């Protein structure tokens, strides 16, 4: 019998004559966790679709050996029956069904006569959650009543119920808090000890280093290296991913911070479901010309609600004033904000940033389409010229501006959303989690773009859950805690510990080393 549970040898997958995968080799042993790393568009998702038979046998070249035997699956159900289960970044749970019903979806236990055996499913679901160290979870409740971390565990329980021997986790922590991530990594360690193998796909290389035994890097559809994690470190992984050494993960463009041009006054946001509860409580701050202002805070602190209100996109009731260049401006709707010179790249690009049914170019010019129209027709040549310039400026990888935007990787979709907002020529640009789900190379390009925009005099407000990112690119940092301003710091020798201390504080007076900005 082979020492390997899985062997993928010489995998080649082509689309229209273009090789998306070009001779990929991957091996996984029982109880081993393999980190699969690469930039967006490198071929990670395509490789996993080959493995799980989304692309069935016969549509690709090479061989897959499972327990030493050829695997020629024609459907996902065949690979799941073999013990290969993928947990996608976008969870597949049905919100209104119970935890137990979600775990058994498609594999329901029945009584004679075909009726559902709910007691047996409840008992088995409780057993699975105990196995995952969540003994107090009420499996009879709708899964929607649990947060993202618990829902991720339900997906794992669902996979284990299918007798998974190889668990493929695609960006499993993208919507989790730090404590939920730690629970997830502990569970993966437990599964490894029981002989369950894992493929861990993530841009968060600290997680890869913490849980993986080996790391396989692919770049431009080719296998670059597979190395024991003990012989690797994060800078080496990054070098293999991008094909060059990156000495500075947070590049800075020289830029001058000028006079105050933007002011948020007494911004208060009320909860959508409970209008008496304040999600943001009387927050005021200033922003200078060419300044990059980072907004930090714990999950649920109110950061997204704050910037959504500034842009006129908060769905609930809110109050306060927004001033630009010494005058109050109308930001009650996104359109009015854009016309006033305030633009925002939202946190959830798939739901709020792109129109999936439109092409790359159409998404880029969507916010300024009227500028190409003379009431009777659209100047297609002028529009295409703008699209080509933005694609070039953003280093956006696409074979054609007419391709569906959904054909792009996450990083390139984000660049398209940025290009759309930049075509409006904003004076204030709000970025909410601009690098979430984006690979290290695309992150680097986004940071460089932010610096270049600041050098041109654009003022930037950036919300990020990654403290290292906030400290790496910001001139000044605001800290939000429980909907209130807890700190306002000039980013000079500022530490993560200082930011966290401010976020966790309950003082009425905010921590402040930036009084001279007032």
Swiss-Prot record:
Positions contributing to ATP binding: 38-45
Record gene name: xylG
EC identifiers of the protein: 7.5.2.10
Keyword Transferase among UniProt keywords: no
Function: Part of the ABC transporter complex XylFGH involved in xylose import. Responsible for energy coupling to the transport system.
GO MF annotation terms: ABC-type D-xylose transporter activity; ATP binding; ATP hydrolysis activity
Residue ranges constituting the ABC transporter domain according to the UniProt record: 6-245, 262-507
Name of protein: Xylose import ATP-binding protein XylG
Keywords of this entry: ATP-binding, Cell inner membrane, Cell membrane, Membrane, Nucleotide-binding, Repeat, Sugar transport, Translocase, Transport
Known catalytic reactions: D-xylose(out) + ATP + H2O = D-xylose(in) + ADP + phosphate + H(+)
Subcellular location field: Cell inner membrane
The species this protein was found in: Pseudomonas syringae pv. syringae (strain B728a)
Name of the top EC class for this enzyme: translocase
Statement: the UniProt record of this protein carries the keyword Flavoprotein: no
GO annotation, cellular component aspect: plasma membrane
Quaternary data: The complex is composed of two ATP-binding proteins (XylG), two transmembrane proteins (XylH) and a solute-binding protein (XylF).
Domain of life: Bacteria
